[in-house]
């Protein structure tokens, strides 16, 4: 467990439970977010305790106790690079320090610093401008990095189709004009068509697991030049993904660098909110609103039109799913679609495993600011109830 967690502990003293729980919550959310593990034996779970006797966790004391490990770190310089947010505060400094300490403890290399003048930013822009069928491949790492808002700005300025990973379907609204589907084994046909026909892929926030690239991974993105950004350097070296330009960096930093560079180039984006028909109008191509000018599709369509065509023609939801009598069971795809359409913007939906997770990820109509939270790693039964409590 130690090698895959930020902190792990078996609780043997019932009176330490408050301290350990508070420590885990603080550590998992501070610095680079990551898992913490508490092993609580059943006899400890059944012990009676007095709340007044429990000692809490003090983050400042924890930092003081770890000063020996941090005494060689140039705190201001390193932490600013690791916590690239709009405003830099003391809490951000602590986050950056903990990132460094954790990586040194586990022998992990530091992600590189990226800004608008970095060569990789120019390379990405050059390849998108030259591409005929580019795709922006996104994952939940964008949200973990706190970059979901800047991602939408960058996507609008780039103007290329966006596909979403299994655990990131809520990173972009369903009706967003650039959304092109969900690739992977549990994704949909439009998303897989887009990836397999792409000639350039920019992947940010996704580790491109087997669930995303498939077991026949040698044919994944068969014609695409790929730029892959990951905060874990080892993810960029695995044999199941071909990476032409690996970017070992924080997702926020790369997106911020792209945003700044596109601003410098005078590219402001279309500003067309969730209107696919309006975006596809020919007068928008080449007007400087976005970096990409439409590209090449099939049968007289450009690339944006081609992806929009696939989204409509090969949607996992079909109209006949609604064709049933009142005394017949509802189709699960129809149920999920209607449920999602009845929800308001910025509402949170948490699902368990099985059809709720798989069908939900395929047909859920994500609205502006809404969340769709599912358990995507180890398929634990019963995840939905505690997750829903946490989401509230």
What does each model-identified segment do?
Residues 10-12, 38-40, 137-138, 163-165, ...:
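General beta-strand structural signal in soluble alpha/beta enzymes
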